[in-house]
């Protein structure tokens, strides 16, 4: 469905939003675009909110397009949580809505941001030093320059908290950026803690009667996230190596920055490519062989073909490192969440680094 049609739906809804969107049960309506935010709210609020996730379990998040029903769902929300600037359709749709009674929150706005870049040349054409990141060209770091700018949509309540912009260094190679910051901010447990605290604040403001409940749950959940962070730190501190290889897209930029890991990947996190060049495959195979890397990673909901091929060629074990961007229908119905999936990553990373 075209954006123009979706915008017309949003415009039609502009005058139909009531000043109180709570259901008859008195619960506030929370809408999230993707699974991480959905799970964070679920852990904090339990059944004391009406919670909806727009992205269906098992669906590809990067190609998601909202339906008219999704637009109506967003309109009915008291709090709308999305990732950030990568979801460009949201900005345009929200501008067409009456957001006077909505609180709008972007997860990217509470963490230090790093730029991500798409490069045209495969990684095998650069030297080992410059190949330390996605395709060997992505040397971007958060330098902690905070700017307290929040985004406002219509007259809604926007929570920006603060931005911290990174600087991109191309090291002499021609690079072409996708003009976005890496949106996979939740892959760092430290970032997840910041996001959970911000969401808890929003929920407490929206529903003061349940604020103590939200804050108690958040405190317990944050303690578990801190333990998760410590577990990853322990794995890295005692590892034989600090290098991981991805035969897939790479959504773990915030994660590897948090634990000072070196990574080699077929595609950047925002890449729309699905088939790597022969040169990229050859480079990754050579890297695994020369450094005797025992594991080649793929991400969730991947076709795994490239990981299969590289595993067969090198003898490296194929393993899933779950970014928790989305979950399968089976995992969703089983109630698996961020903590469970990331705890699996702890042991998988231990295997890969030893």
Task: Locate predicted features.
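Bacterial N-terminal signal peptides
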Residues: 1-8
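Extracytoplasmic metal-acquisition and chelation regions
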Residues: 13-354
